[in-house]
From Swiss-Prot:
Residues 1-43 are annotated as: Disordered. The gene is Golph3l. Residues 176-187 are annotated as: Beta-hairpin required for oligomerization. One of its GO terms (biological process) is protein targeting to Golgi apparatus. It is found in: Golgi apparatus, Golgi stack membrane; Golgi apparatus, trans-Golgi network membrane. Keywords: Golgi apparatus, Lipid-binding, Membrane, Phosphoprotein. The modification Phosphoserine is found at residue 112. This is Golgi phosphoprotein 3-like. GO terms for molecular function: cargo adaptor activity; phosphatidylinositol-4-phosphate binding.
Length: 285
């Protein structure tokens, strides 16, 4: 169950709070969502998987919630979207028999290395697989959720730990050992809180001050991160610091976004099909 469905706080926005916040945004509606702040060029470049994990980590404790059973599949969905955005994979063109996003296979476009171990490992699996598989099947295979013993070789192991090590190398996390009564656990507390706050502010702005009410006008990576953060059940961490009025608006706008029909949105001009295919897979699971 995701944040949007198990959240106990009031999530219905009153007309007065909606009107109040929208009036604050009038001067920002015409701003292009792709326009970055001047300092953005100096920001650390993170993959979608690193961003999702960073949003899900408890800052001081250095681990994700034990009750979060969504983030594993969310990270695998992020891998597929990241590969598509880097021009390595794509969905096969629609045909009369295969029009739906979830019916179309994931095809290899380029096997050139990305420099990221997880991405390159996934790329090797996709290249070596015959027959080709759908987005939903790939998420299941990469997560290890398959009854076919011959398909277990495609499971990506220790994904969170490997992503966390990347974030340690980028100076955002550190590594510690914590004792939990019967066992020791490696944790990764956040050391660069500025980077995490920047990431959270980016998502908050995308559904508040920079809201454009049209996914086709949103920055592709921001749209992908919203979809993945929702599917990974980490949006609560992003919006919890907002005032009640802004929290309600942010959650409801995100809810409206992820409840759009992926089949319709995926066919629009310049749409990134993989984002909508991943969302469709999560909606079905």
């Amino acid at each position: 169950m995701t944040t949007l469905t198990h959240r106990t706080r009031r999530t219905e926005v009153s007309k007065s709070s909606e009107k109040k916040i929208e009036s604050e945004e009038d001067t920002n509606q015409e701003r292009s969502p792709d326009n970055e702040d001047p300092g953005d060029s100096k920001d650390i470049r993170l993959t979608l998987m690193e961003e999702v994990l960073l949003l899900g980590l408890k800052d001081k404790e250095g681990y994700t919630s034990f009750w979060n059973d969504c983030i594993s599949s969310g990270l695998r969905g992020g891998i597929l979207i990241e590969l598509a955005m880097r021009g390595r994979i794509y969905l096969e063109p629609p045909t009369m028999r295969k029009k739906r996003l979830l019916d179309r296979k994931v095809l290899l476009k380029s096997d050139s290395p990305t420099g990221d171990v997880l991405l390159d490992e996934t790329l090797k699996h996709i290249k070596a697989t015959e027959p080709t598989e759908t987005v939903q099947t790939w998420i299941e295979l990469l997560t290890g959720e398959t009854w076919n013993p011959f398909k277990l070789q495609y499971q990506l192991r220790n994904v969170r730990e490997r992503i966390a090590k990347n974030l340690v190398e980028k100076g955002i996390l550190t590594t510690e050992k914590q004792n939990f009564l019967l066992f020791d656990m490696t944790t990764h507390p956040v050391t660069n809180t500025t980077e995490k706050q920047r990431l959270m502010k980016k998502l908050q702005d995308s559904v508040l001050e920079r809201w454009v009410n049209d996914p086709q006008r949103m920055d592709r990576r921001t749209l992908a991160l919203l979809v993945l953060a929702h599917s990974s059940d980490v949006l609560e961490n992003v919006f919890s610091c907002l005032t009640d009025d802004k929290y309600d608006v942010a959650m409801n706008r995100t809810k409206d976004l992820v409840e759009l029909d992926p089949e319709v949105e995926g066919t629009k001009h310049n749409a990134t099909e993989m984002i909508w295919a991943v969302l469709a897979a999560f909606n079905k699971s």
